Design a protein with these regions (language model features):
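Well-ordered beta-sheet/strand-loop patches within structured domains
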Residues: 4-24, 28-327
């Protein structure tokens, strides 16, 4: 029996993403066909019951599932590290637990991340322990609360998200400064058991590709630190980061300055920096300080190419009648 080559041929097809925005990968199809004339010649020349071999021509598509997968979560878009070296064990446990809840969380284009939804209620049943947290203003402003320390994780994630140029949906500052992050770049979160204001930290994936949150803690005898990274796909219009700088000129001299390898050596790298203006004030609540935080971008020549105010509709106010360094 003779077959036509088109009966056995398989057209090559490149791998592709699904069209539903979920970035499911449909694998490639390897093309194959054989030369019918060569097969016919070999068949006619063959003896009775002789086996003939017909070479198959194989075409590997240029875009494979592996190459598409390699484009996802390939580039470090934003990162932040904060320290909790002097925290008690309960607070350390809460930080580790919150970090584990947000770790490996994926956001597709248009998705909104809600810290409270992902981490969940800070309850004993969920594994949270009592640790110092802000609960008001004045002498009784710091008390042990279940989940104390959760705000360090939300604040670290908030900084990573604005380094990555993600869209902030909701963010509220603490009533007092915290010692693990620069003024104007913190983000408090609460889920009251009954009544009270729910405070969340939310941001949107405004990219054309999915992003992944990576969160981890490192603890030694000398230092305990929390790192949150946001991985995605660097697009042509994005600033390729080579340095993240969130340096505070404040009493505790907090410094975060991370240099990273350029994702694409043929593109210009940029330094992304937070700069905070501070204004003192006094009202019925006492002395305070307001901040306006800028996101600045510098090119490889050290020239400022972008200066924009974060949360431009309102400045961040902190009570300053005393200093507490919790949550």
């Amino acid at each position: 029996m003779l077959f036509r080559s088109q009966d056995l041929a398989v057209e090559p097809m490149e791998a592709r993403f699904s069209d539903d925005g979920r970035f499911t990968i449909y694998p490639e199809t390897v093309g194959c066909w054989f030369d019918t004339e060569a097969a016919k010649t070999a068949w006619l020349a063959a003896g009775v019951a002789e086996t003939i071999v017909v070479p198959i021509q194989v075409t590997i598509p240029a875009v494979t599932a592996a190459s598409l997968e390699a484009t996802l979560y390939h580039d470090l878009l934003g990162a932040m590290t904060t320290r909790y070296t002097n925290s008690g064990e309960n607070r350390c446990s809460n930080v580790r637990l919150c970090a584990s809840r947000i770790n490996e969380h994926i956001l597709y284009p248009g998705d909104v991340f809600s810290y409270n939804e992902v981490v969940g209620k800070r309850t004993e049943e969920a594994g949270f322990l009592p640790a110092p947290a802000y609960v008001g203003v004045g002498e009784d402003s710091v008390k042990d609360e279940l989940g104390g320390g959760a705000c360090q994780v939300s604040s670290t994630l908030y900084c990573a998200s604005i380094f990555a140029f993600l869209e902030t949906i909701e963010r509220t500052a603490h009533v007092y400064p915290v010692n693990y992050i620069q003024l104007g770049t913190d983000a408090t979160v609460t889920i009251p058991e009954e009544g009270g204001n729910v405070m969340d930290m939310k941001f949107r994936n405004n990219k054309n590709y999915p992003i992944k949150i990576v969160a981890y803690t490192e603890e030694t005898e000398e230092m305990k630190s929390l790192t949150v990274e946001i991985w995605g796909t660097l697009e042509e219009t994005d600033y390729m980061p080579v340095e993240f700088d969130n340096t505070a000129s404040y009493t505790w001299d907090l410094v975060y300055d991370r240099v990273i390898e350029p994702a694409y050596p043929n593109r210009e790298g940029y330094k992304i920096k937070f700069e905070t203006e501070r204004f003192s004030f006094e009202d019925a609540m006492g002395a305070g300080r307001r901040t306006i935080t800028h996101r600045e971008v510098y090119n490889s020549a050290g020239e400022k190419v972008l200066d924009e105010i974060l949360n431009p509709t309102i400045s961040t106010g902190y009570a300053m009648d005393t200093y507490y360094y919790h949550n």
